[in-house]
């Protein structure tokens, strides 16, 4: 498996990164992520154009046209799970690693109960707050228009994902 990735460049605080997944050189999947950059000390948003190290590294003709829309949660959600964030869920910065949230979402949706003929074809996660080891997230699920949604709420009632 080969993952090929690049950024699209940006003049605003929002930056897109595109991914191609290849097996034996054949495309088998793709992904898009949207990011904002923030200063480590002051947490102020930065523009990608302020990062001189990244000048000229855009993907050019490889850039995808797909953009991500803001997620609109269903009005009614039901509590499905409470999950304590563990040390093994975190990255070097002490935050829960982004890849772990996809696992939490799939677990909350009970994907193991799907027939083998059905599978997850699209996944969009909106990160709204950082979680750390020891934090507890309540995972709520809901459905709207044939799509399934999962929301993570921290102990203070603030949305995390």
What function would you assign to each model-found segment?
Residues 23, 35-39, 87, 100, ...:
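Generic secondary-structure microfeatures
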Residues 75-88:
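Short amphipathic
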Residues 122-127:
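Short structured motifs
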Residues 97-118:
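Active-site helix/loop of acyl-thioester processing domains in fatty-acid/polyketide metabolism
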Residues 2-73, 128-136, 142-161:
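HotDog/MaoC-like acyl-thioester-processing domains
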């Amino acid at each position: 498996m080969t993952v090929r990735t690049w950024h699209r460049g940006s003049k605003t605080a929002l930056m897109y990164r595109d991914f191609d997944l290849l097996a034996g050189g054949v495309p088998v999947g793709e992904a898009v992520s949207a990011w904002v950059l923030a200063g480590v000390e002051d947490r102020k948003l930065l523009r990608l154009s302020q990062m001189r190290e990244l000048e000229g590294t855009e993907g050019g003709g490889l850039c995808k046209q797909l953009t991500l829309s803001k997620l609109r949660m269903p009005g009614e959600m039901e509590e499905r799970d409470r999950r304590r964030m563990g040390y093994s869920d975190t990255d070097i910065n002490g935050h829960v690693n982004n890849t772990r949230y996809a696992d939490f979402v799939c677990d909350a949706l009970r994907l193991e109960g799907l027939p083998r003929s059905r599978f997850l074809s699209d996944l969009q996660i909106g990160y709204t707050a950082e979680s750390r080891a020891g934090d507890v997230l309540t995972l709520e699920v809901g459905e709207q228009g044939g799509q399934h949604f999962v929301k993570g709420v921290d102990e203070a009632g603030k949305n995390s994902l």
